[in-house]
């Protein structure tokens, strides 16, 4: 089954702040796109990015014709009849989040395989690895036509955890791009019925360096991911396992492990305190809550974390002396605690979602590997925001240590800030340059 994602209470509070300032960001995006409204599509061989024309509102929704609705309903009925028996025989489990019944991944796989064998372009879902499109040839043909300014369309279907059917039809007609979206659910009588149909203007779309397709059909805001990635082939599972194990548990948002250069001889501006909640989650398989620890407002807002817990959580992942660690992490000998700030409206550094992927693993020696990581940010229209190399030392007990990080490539787009959450740990950009 697919994994559920949770938002911490502090992060929820921050969303309220972004609601107040989000319109300003959207307005800037609209001004930028309006200045390019006469640009429809770049020529073949260049980055094929469509920009919105005559967009005067925040809503990208367009009118759906009755003919389009009828065609969708006809196809939904046809496809649902192919997998109806599998759905009816599948074990149903009540979803704790949406008030609907879910079916297991095994049954979803069976449905997908039947539709794949029928030749339909279907999203192949997985409980661990990223979804990807089976029978993707239609997308490649579609994209070649788009680059040559030829009318074209291609349709992608997917099966949800409830067994419902989702439909996306990408269209390029008369130089204008749009996406026709629809969803169909099984009702109480076990009949499929279309519950929504809408059409959205495509604001941007392109192929990544790995020849995966992405598109944007809503305006960029701080409340959601505006761009969606449709992988057209499966990931390299061996490399993706490395991404899952070493990169994703830490990430890039409000933690700087992968955002600046450092090594075991010079930790530079690496902030250990901001790693506490990430590594706590790795060690305990649960989230850390600031309310569980004493909270102080002087000399700055922070939770006081017992030294043993803090050190036992972070130290095993690094080669550093306890003396240097305590100095860098602001150890308070009097209370035998370390300060830690949860992400809040006071310290959050907003950046759109990033997609890291380990593209290579280099064996340095018997116990050391170097991971080459490419980071995409599709909301900023780049599949190569930056590249960094992470050095890992593997241990005999299956654990590991982070030995170093080096940023080897950055483009014209600014990468996420490496600043720490706690004010006294923040640094000047000159300090960053000196330690690079």
Language-model features: where?
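Mature, Sec-exported extracytoplasmic domains of Gram-positive
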Residues: 32-436
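Short stretches within intrinsically disordered, low-complexity N-terminal or propeptide regions
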Residues: 12-13, 29, 42
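N-terminal Sec-pathway targeting helices
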Residues: 2-14
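Core hydrophobic alpha-helical transmembrane segments of single-pass membrane proteins
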Residues: 12-22
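Hydrophobic single-pass membrane-insertion segments
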Residues: 23-34
């Amino acid at each position: 089954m697919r994994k559920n994602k949770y938002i911490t209470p502090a992060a929820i509070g921050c969303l309220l702040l972004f609601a107040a300032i989000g319109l300003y960001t959207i307005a800037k995006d609209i001004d930028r796109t309006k200045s390019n409204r006469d640009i429809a599509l770049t020529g073949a061989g260049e980055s094929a990015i469509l920009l919105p024309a005559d967009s005067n509102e925040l809503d990208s929704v367009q009118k759906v014709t009755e003919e389009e609705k009828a065609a969708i309903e006809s196809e939904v009925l046809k496809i649902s009849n192919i997998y109806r028996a599998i759905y009816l025989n599948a074990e149903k489990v009540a979803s704790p989040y949406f008030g609907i019944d879910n079916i297991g991944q095994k049954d979803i796989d069976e449905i997908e395989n039947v539709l794949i064998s029928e030749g339909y372009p279907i999203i192949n879902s997985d409980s661990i690895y990223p979804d990807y499109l089976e029978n993707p040839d239609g997308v490649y043909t579609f994209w070649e036509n788009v680059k040559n300014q030829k009318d074209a369309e291609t349709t992608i279907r997917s099966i949800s955890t409830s067994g419902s059917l989702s439909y996306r039809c990408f269209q390029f007609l008369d130089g204008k791009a749009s996406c026709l979206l629809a969803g169909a659910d099984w009702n109480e009588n076990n009949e499929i019925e279309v519950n929504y149909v809408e059409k959205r203007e495509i604001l941007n779309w392109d192929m990544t360096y790995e020849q995966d397709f992405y598109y944007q059909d809503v305006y960029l805001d701080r409340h959601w991911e505006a761009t969606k990635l449709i992988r057209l082939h499966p990931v390299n599972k061996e490399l993706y396992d490395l991404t899952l194990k070493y990169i994703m548990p830490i990430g890039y948002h409000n933690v700087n492990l992968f955002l600046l250069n450092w090594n075991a001889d010079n930790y530079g501006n690496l902030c250990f305190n901001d790693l506490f909640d990430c590594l706590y989650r790795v060690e305990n398989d649960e989230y850390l809550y600031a309310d569980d620890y004493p909270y102080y407002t002087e000399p700055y807002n922070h939770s006081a974390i017992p030294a043993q817990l803090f050190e036992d959580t972070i130290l095993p992942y690094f080669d550093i002396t306890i003396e240097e660690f305590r100095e860098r992490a602001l150890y308070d000998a009097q209370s035998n605690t370390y300060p830690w700030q949860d992400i809040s409206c006071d310290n959050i550094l907003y950046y759109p979602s990033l997609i890291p992927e380990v593209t290579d693993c280099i064996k340095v020696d018997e116990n050391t590997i170097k991971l080459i990581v490419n980071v995409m940010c599709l909301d900023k229209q780049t599949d190569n925001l930056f590249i960094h190399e992470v050095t890992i030392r593997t241990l005999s007990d299956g654990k590991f240590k982070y030995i170093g990080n080096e940023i080897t490539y950055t483009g014209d787009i600014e990468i996420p800030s490496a600043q720490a959450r706690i004010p006294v740990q923040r640094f000047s950009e000159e300090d960053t340059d000196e330690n690079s």
